[in-house]
């Protein structure tokens, strides 16, 4: 746990992290738990016993974000929530699917944009009841495809670009109800979704060469930014997307 993460105090806060069983989601969930929050995570398997990772200390909910009925049900169940982190996703091309196929494109948009919108909308009233210092928050996990065209993932890219817009819309509409909405756009960061890309030098080497800080990210890099954006220190920040990318977006 890095010092900047442990410096936050979220004692008593109730946090939901979708896709919190591995990768970036697991890093975010662990950071909130270390800061004193009560953390609920979601995953696709039946129970925590089905995972190799130690998920003790979390409340666990099974959720397939492609199943909108499940998404709506999980959202309705959140009668007390202060922070929602929409993180769950899947790299469809890594499963052999082509996002240029219209049906796969639609799946990608549903997974990475529509599900998060429905989750946030379903949690809105409970978030509005939050008394968390700095206000309740919705966080979306974006990516470099929010800014750059990446040919292999047109659906994912469309969804992550759309995330910037829906984040601003939620911030404008829900701000008067005490709810802030922000996003982070994550660069090449170690996770289950990026494992194949990081293992491929033809992909990872050029990315690293363009990154001024000279390394790929780790989940803790993202977690620190997310905790800041949902903290009282960021109580006047809403509708923004913060790149967490080692400087990739500013490198020519």
Q: Can you describe what each PLM-predicted range is?
A:
Residues 98-117, 139, 163, 213:
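Catalytic Tyr-X3-Lys loop
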Residues 125, 172-176, 235:
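Alpha-helical segment proximal to the catalytic Tyr-Lys
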Residues 14, 21-22:
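Conserved glycine-rich cofactor-binding loop
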Residues 183, 205-237, 246:
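C-terminal helical subdomain
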Residues 2-6, 148, 227, 238-252:
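Short C-terminal tail/terminal secondary-structure segment
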Residues 91-106, 129-134, 152-155, 195-199:
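Conserved mid-core segment of classical short-chain dehydrogenase/reductases
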Residues 143:
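Residue(s) in the substrate-gating loop at a strand-loop-helix junction
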Residues 120, 159, 167:
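Active-site helix of classical SDR
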């Amino acid at each position: 746990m890095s010092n900047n993460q442990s410096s936050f105090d979220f004692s008593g806060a109730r946090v939901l992290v979708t896709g919190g069983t591995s990768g970036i989601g697991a890093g975010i969930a662990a950071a909130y738990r270390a800061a004193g929050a009560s953390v609920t995570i979601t995953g696709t398997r039946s129970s925590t016993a089905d995972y190799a990772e130690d998920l003790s200390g979390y409340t666990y909910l099974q959720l397939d974000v492609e199943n909108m009925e499940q998404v709506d049900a999980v959202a309705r169940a959140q009668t007390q929530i202060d922070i929602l982190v929409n993180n769950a996703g899947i790299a469809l091309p890594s499963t052999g699917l082509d996002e240029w196929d219209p049906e796969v494109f639609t799946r990608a948009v549903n997974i990475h944009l529509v599900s998060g919108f429905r989750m946030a909308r379903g949690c809105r009233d409970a978030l509005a009841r939050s008394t968390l210092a700095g206000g309740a928050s919705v966080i979306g996990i974006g990516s470099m495809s929010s800014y750059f065209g990446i040919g292999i993932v047109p659906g994912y890219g469309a969804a992550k670009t759309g995330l910037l817009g829906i984040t601003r819309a939620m911030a404008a509409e829900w701000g008067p109800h005490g709810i802030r909405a922000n996003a982070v756009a994550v660069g090449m960061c170690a996770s289950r979704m990026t494992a194949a890309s990081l293992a491929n030098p033809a992909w990872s080497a050029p990315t690293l060469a363009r990154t001024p800080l000279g390394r790929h990210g780790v989940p803790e890099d993202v977690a620190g930014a997310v905790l800041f954006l949902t903290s009282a220190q960021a109580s006047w920040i809403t509708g923004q997307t913060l790149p967490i990318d080692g400087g990739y977006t500013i490198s020519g």
